[in-house]
């Protein structure tokens, strides 16, 4: 598994499926620490400290990671549980999928090997810009290449709030830029390649209060696209992004090894899972491409209530679909 990127902190056509799930739990831990690392005078002149873990001169505080036991077994479609959140006895979570019914599912495996087995528990979440049920079908003109009907307007130039497409600048050195745009400065360049036209937008949106004794989260993801390799380098630039809306960071936290947003044009295909790779035989991706599991890591303030939006969408048109697998959300410390 690769670790990629670091950030801070319905049924029937045309209907949306609201899979909102809320679980209330005891989030107490054995100790409490203040992990704030930002000093300086806040005037934006660059004298603010970098977050713990990014500044070698800053000692990170003690850490207590809440215990976790997977709760994704069975047949239900609890989106939070599928990625490792909201389990009994754990942290309060409010989560909901906004997607067409055919555009998301729970999955126990993909392909002919164990490459895409769960990285936590027994199942993981799939979001797709096409029918997720097509994933196990052989490729043809229609499998993994269908319009779903959009949650957003087809060809919409704006992604739903709080996502912002424009670059914010350096939010580390100038914290007053938080909230003005994408602190990762990775979304705008990719969307400009599709003239900001998005189709088949699907998302999982999570609101959660960060435990007082942690200051980061991570999760695993894999990206697959029928547009690989034929559309690589073109304007048909499907994307997967994860927007973090926190007190000290507003922006994308799902990045490639090179620090780019995850898109058809930045991923291309990985050598082990290029078209005709054995792991993809018998799937709609057998002539296309995929990534292995990757890990995204993001920093955020302890005790802050944050919103995290996992989103995937087609670029420029709604055919040649893309999918993202998401699993193993966990808390941690820098």
What are these regions (language model features)?
Residues 50-334:
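Aromatic (Trp/Tyr/Phe) and Gly/Pro-enriched flexible surface segments
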Residues 1-58:
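Ser/Thr-rich, Pro/Gly/Ala-heavy low-complexity intrinsically disordered linkers and tails
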